[in-house]
Regions:
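Secondary-structure end/capping motifs
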Residues: 243-331
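Pocket-lining segment of extracytoplasmic ligand-binding domains
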Residues: 140, 185-283
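C-terminal motif of bacterial Sec signal peptides marking the signal peptidase cleavage site
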Residues: 4-9
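Bacterial lipoprotein signal-peptidase II cleavage site
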Residues: 10-20
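Short, glycine-/small- and polar/acidic-enriched structural segments
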Residues: 27-183, 187-200, 219-220, 227
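Conserved C-terminal helix/tail region of periplasmic/extracytoplasmic solute-binding proteins
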Residues: 317-361
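Surface-exposed patches in mature extracellular/periplasmic domains of secreted proteins
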Residues: 81-82, 120-122, 179, 261-272, ...
Length: 361
């Protein structure tokens, strides 16, 4: 597969002209296709640490698809997919144990940098809203985030950033409701405990509740204009600075992996399960639930993608609004200097209009 790039650079004059045009499209001063291929290969493995094992989630499924479909190989890139969990995967990249990872949101990237004095940079951005929401039992008087005051909210670890922002933007304070830590991941069992509200992922727990016939109301930050994001692949600034063309090609392959996964969800989930099953499925994933996860997330991505823009290009204005909301919520003691933590130029430079530029295609 990698030979396709070499052939494009070393074939007849017409083919060579095509390759030169492709190189020019990728940016003035780019190396030839052959040189770029050899440089990518010479780098060795690029380690990407996932945010939730091998789940079919945005930020993970396109990575798996790109590898399985040979897109990295076509660009002479050796990618090692390491199962991990957010936000600790960010620490591995900060420490230099991996080149890239995926965050649940841009806020998570910023928080990792602030807490760990890191140099993480968001290079793609799939979801332009929160993937989290609040579930309340059917018939509850809680109709908005301000209504959470004086209620009992079940928490798994911590309240997600997007929901902290939603509470703050409603005019309420997080301290106005009681929180109780929950064990396990069964939303049916959690609601049976008598809690008033449960933070969930829109691409996960609602499916389980629907399957069990449990009625509920979903408080979705999207319905309350809460600025948020999900599915945010990142790299270290040092990797981007030292290997700009390799970084471009990794992002290029990820975008093509997303296109494949969006067009063929069943095949994308099947690719994920090749890795899940090979690892012994320690998270007890089921194909039906992972298909629901990816169909839900890809629908949100498609529904909110701006017209006339290439998919995956980071929305810098939205990122700024997301961080401002969290400053107001008290998540950050002071406004962090977030602007260097996103690079939208890499992804935007890989498009001709809304068409991904791919060598030889």
């Amino acid at each position: 597969m990698a030979l396709s790039l070499v052939a494009a650079a070393c074939g007849d004059d017409a083919t060579a002209d095509d390759a030169a045009g492709e190189a020019a499209a990728e940016g003035e001063g780019s190396s030839t296709a052959e040189e770029r291929c050899e440089a990518n290969r010479a780098y060795g493995p690029v380690t990407f640490v996932t945010a939730f094992d091998f789940a079919a989630a945005a930020g993970i499924v396109e990575l798996i698809a790109a590898d399985a479909e040979g897109y990295f190989e076509e660009l002479c890139i050796d990618v090692e997919i390491q199962p991990g969990f957010a936000p600790s995967n960010g620490a591995l990249v900060i420490e230099g144990q991996a080149e890239m990872g995926m965050a649940g949101s841009f806020a998570e990237v910023v928080n990792n940098n602030v807490a760990g004095e890191g140099d993480l940079v968001a290079v793609l951005h799939w979801g332009r809203t929160a993937i989290e929401a609040i579930v309340v039992p059917e018939g509850s008087e809680i109709q908005n985030f301000a209504d959470l005051c004086d209620s009992l909210v079940g928490i798994k670890g911590d309240l997600p950033f997007s929901l902290q922002a939603a509470v703050a933007l409603s005019g309420a304070e997080r301290s106005c409701f009681e929180e109780t830590l929950l064990d396990g991941f069964d939303p049916v069992a959690h609601l049976d405990l008598g809690i008033d509200a449960l933070p969930v992922y829109k691409s996960n727990e609602p499916n389980a509740l629907d399957g069990a016939g449990v009625g509920y109301t979903l408080l979705d930050p999207l319905d309350f204009d809460v600025p948020a994001s999900f599915g945010v692949p990142f790299a270290s600034q040092s990797f981007l600075t030292e290997n700009p063309e390799l970084a471009e090609d990794v992002v290029r392959a990820l975008i093509r992996g997303y296109e494949f996964a969006a067009a063929d969800p069943d095949a994308a989930v099947a690719h994920a399960f090749d890795l899940i099953d090979a690892a012994g499925n320690p998270m007890f994933f089921a194909q039906e639930t992972e298909l629901f996860r990816w169909q839900t997330e890809s629908a949100l991505i498609a529904d909110l993608a701006p017209a006339g823009s290439g998919v995956g290009i980071p929305d810098v204005a939205l990122f700024g609004a997301e961080i401002d909301a969290l400053v107001d919520a008290g998540v950050f003691a002071e406004a962090p200097a977030w602007e260097p933590m996103v690079n939208a130029d890499i992804a935007s430079g890989l498009y001709d209009g809304t068409t991904l530029i791919w060598p030889g295609r």
